[in-house]
C-alpha cells in the first residue's frame, strides 16, 4: 500500500511515469523501508497505464461489490417514526436502575 501511495504522490506532483528511484526517494523521506521486489512488481503492472483510468476502473469494481450498508440505513430509519416513545422509556428505565443501586448500600458503607 505504501508503494501505491508513493506512486500516487509522484503522479500528483506532476511525474506522469514515476521510476523506482522516484518512489524510493519519497518512501525514504518519511523513513519507510523499501522492498525493491514489491516496488518493481508494482511499477511493471502500472507501466504504460493511465492512473486516472485505473482509478475509474477500480471504482466501477467497488460499486458492484455488495457492502451490506442497506440494513443499517433501514434500521436507523425505523425508529425515526416513533422516536419520542422509546427515548422516554429509556429514561424511565435508567431512573429505575439508579434507585436500585442506591438502595443496595442501605445508607451506610461497609468500609467506614
UniProtKB/Swiss-Prot annotation:
Pfam families xref list: Ribosomal_60s
A GO term for molecular function: protein-containing complex binding
Keywords annotated in UniProt: Phosphoprotein, Ribonucleoprotein, Ribosomal protein
InterPro entries, per the entry: P1/P2_N_sf, Ribosomal_P1/P2, Ribosomal_P2
Location of region: Disordered: 83-112
UniProt GO cellular component terms: cytosolic large ribosomal subunit
GO biological processes: cytoplasmic translational elongation
Biased composition (Basic and acidic residues): 89-98
Superkingdom of the organism of origin: Eukaryota
Record PTM: Phosphorylated.
Entry similarity comment: Belongs to the eukaryotic ribosomal protein P1/P2 family.
Function, as annotated: Plays an important role in the elongation step of protein synthesis.
PANTHER family associated with the record: 60S ACIDIC RIBOSOMAL PROTEIN FAMILY MEMBER (PTHR21141), LARGE RIBOSOMAL SUBUNIT PROTEIN P2A (PTHR21141:SF100)
Subunit description: P1 and P2 exist as dimers at the large ribosomal subunit.
Name of the protein in its database record: Large ribosomal subunit protein P2A
Organism the protein comes from: Zea mays
Amino acid at each position: 500500500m505504501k508503494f501505491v501511495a508513493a506512486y500516487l504522490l509522484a503522479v500528483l506532483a506532476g511525474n506522469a511515469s514515476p521510476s523506482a528511484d522516484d518512489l524510493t526517494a519519497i518512501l525514504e523521506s518519511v523513513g519507510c523501508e523499501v522492498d525493491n521486489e514489491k516496488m518493481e512488481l508494482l511499477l511493471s503492472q502500472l507501466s504504460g497505464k493511465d492512473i486516472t483510468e485505473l482509478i475509474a476502473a477500480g471504482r466501477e469494481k467497488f460499486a458492484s461489490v455488495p457492502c451490506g450498508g442497506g440494513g443499517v440505513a433501514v434500521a436507523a430509519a425505523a425508529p425515526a417514526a416513533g422516536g419520542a416513545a422509546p427515548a422516554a422509556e429509556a429514561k424511565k428505565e435508567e431512573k429505575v436502575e439508579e434507585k436500585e443501586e442506591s438502595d443496595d448500600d442501605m445508607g451506610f458503607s461497609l468500609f467506614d
